[in-house]
């Protein structure tokens, strides 16, 4: 067996070994406590800003605050929610996520990461801390394995794979649903065809079904933002 074949066979296995860390659970618990407290005192779920401030305090107090994101790797890209850094030394991708796709509180964000790791266990997210992005916004720092890819997946390949997983296109393919979870942004730039022939869903938006995910996505995605004149 040559080296290339070994790489192809081992990439998927190595990705599966990545497990979500306890930091995500800790951060989720802190955010949940803030939400419960605000709901009790004010009868509202609108507490996103308070949750982010509390998480920043927690990260700074526990040596989890990364002062300079450039220490993670080389700046690679800026998407709608993630600022991406690449470390070729560690074969990792680091994403500073600014919580854009959480509406009035952060709990859907933590649920989404857990769901992603359940559905797409070959390229899971692991939380390693928090940092400010280039816009000065506090972000959670997530890492994923660097995927050796031949190319972006095609829309047809993405649809075929999601159908295989039990998801069906809704609203003329605007998103995919299995009745439990709704997947948005499963577009070619967010799904890679690995050198092992496997599709890797590296960056999708997921909401629980029947929780208003479509309206939330449309209200927060730059794809639907009013154009400035």
PLM feature spans:
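Conserved structural core of kinase catalytic domains
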Residues: 98, 117-173
């Amino acid at each position: 067996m040559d080296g290339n074949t070994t790489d192809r066979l081992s990439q998927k296995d190595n990705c599966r070994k990545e497990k979500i860390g306890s930091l995500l659970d800790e951060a989720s618990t802190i955010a949940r406590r803030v939400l419960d407290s605000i709901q009790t005192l004010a009868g509202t779920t609108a507490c996103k800003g308070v949750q982010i401030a509390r998480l920043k305090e927690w990260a700074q107090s526990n040596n989890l605050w990364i002062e300079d994101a450039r220490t993670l790797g080389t700046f690679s890209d800026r998407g709608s929610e993630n600022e991406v850094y690449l470390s070729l030394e560690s074969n990792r991708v680091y994403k500073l996520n600014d919580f854009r796709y959480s509406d009035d509180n952060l709990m859907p964000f933590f649920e989404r990461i857990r769901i992603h790791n359940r559905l797409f266990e070959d390229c899971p997210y692991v939380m390693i801390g928090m940092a400010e992005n280039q816009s000065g916004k506090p972000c959670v720092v997530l890492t994923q394995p660097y995927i050796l890819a031949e190319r972006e997946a095609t829309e047809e390949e993405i649809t075929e794979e999601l159908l295989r997983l039990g998801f069906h296109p809704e609203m003329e393919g605007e998103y995919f649903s299995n009745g439990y979870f709704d997947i948005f942004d499963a577009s070619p730039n967010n799904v890679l065809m690995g050198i092992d022939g496997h599709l890797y869903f590296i960056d999708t938006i997921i909401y629980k079904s029947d929780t208003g995910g479509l309206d939330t996505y449309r209200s927060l995605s730059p794809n639907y933002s009013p154009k400035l004149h």
